[in-house]
């Protein structure tokens, strides 16, 4: 199969976008520069907050998402990935606006969890991802149940994401997320790092159950698609 150009629809947020690029580079079996896949990144931090819109108190991010996807297509991307879990609430709209495939981080993660044989997983994610049933739809159709934090702990997750990682305070983000994750792992067989900011600060060795990181999952899939090892 021919090699493909990866398109990254980024900016949600910029740190998560840079983190995904790094992971793709690290997961590529390269011995020289020329062995790496071509990657086009459109980093658009002007995309309105996805969670705010889903909760009914923010502007619509779809116009900027569609514009960004089309720019990647114009630049020659063969497929698109998004380092933002909540943005996958709009995956259908984005896909219908372009010809090339949108490879869903959510679906790829759900497949990985199914392959692991897990039947109940905890979810650390934004209010928008939870309310929008972004992971629920992908997992429940596979018979996998989801545990989410209680209202108080979910507030800590949102604080960790917005006042911690997105604001550049990684230490605060990590501290709050670990606190919630430790509670959630007691009633789960694994924990999904269901927000790219969570992926930035939590690592597999932090918990006694597996930490399923969608950023790793999509990075691995993107490399295989780009190098022609796998097909869509």
Curated annotation (Swiss-Prot):
Binding positions (substrate): 49-51, 85-87, 166
Superkingdom: Archaea
Keywords: Isomerase
Active site: residue positions: 84 (proton donor/acceptor), 195 (proton donor/acceptor)
Catalysed reactions listed for this entry: L-aspartate = D-aspartate
Pfam families the record matches: Asp_Glu_race
GO MF, one example: aspartate racemase activity
PROSITE patterns assigned: ASP_GLU_RACEMASE_1 (PS00923), ASP_GLU_RACEMASE_2 (PS00924)
InterPro entries reported in the protein's UniProt record: Asp/Glu/hydantoin_racemase, Asp/Glu_race, Asp_race
SUPFAM superfamilies: Aspartate/glutamate racemase
Positions in coiled-coil regions: none
Enzyme Commission number, as recorded: 5.1.1.13
Family from the record: Belongs to the aspartate/glutamate racemases family.
Protein known as: Aspartate racemase
């Amino acid at each position: 199969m021919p090699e493909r150009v990866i398109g990254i629809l980024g900016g949600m947020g910029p740190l998560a976008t840079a983190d995904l690029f790094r992971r793709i580079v690290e997961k590529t079996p390269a011995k020289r520069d020329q062995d790496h896949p071509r990657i086009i990144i459109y980093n658009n931090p002007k995309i309105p907050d996805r969670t705010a819109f889903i909760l009914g108190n923010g502007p619509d991010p779809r116009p900027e998402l569609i514009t960004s996807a089309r720019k990647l297509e114009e630049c020659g991307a063969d497929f698109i990935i998004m380092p933002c879990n909540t943005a996958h609430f709009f995956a259908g709209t984005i896909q219908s606006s372009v010809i090339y495939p949108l490879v869903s981080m959510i679906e790829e993660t759900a497949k990985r969890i199914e392959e692991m044989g897990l039947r109940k997983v905890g979810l650390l994610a934004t209010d928008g991802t939870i309310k929008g049933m972004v992971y629920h739809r992908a997992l429940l159709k596979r018979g996998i149940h989801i545990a989410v934090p209680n209202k108080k702990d979910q507030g800590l997750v949102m604080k960790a994401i917005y006042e911690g990682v997105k604001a550049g305070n990684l230490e605060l983000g990590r501290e709050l997320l670990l606190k919630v994750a430790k509670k959630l792992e007691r009633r789960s067989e694994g924990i999904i790092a269901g927000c790219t900011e969570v992926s930035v600060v939590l690592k597999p060795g932090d918990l006694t159950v597996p930490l399923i990181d969608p950023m790793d999952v999509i990075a691995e899939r993107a490399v295989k698609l780009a190098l022609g090892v796998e097909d869509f």
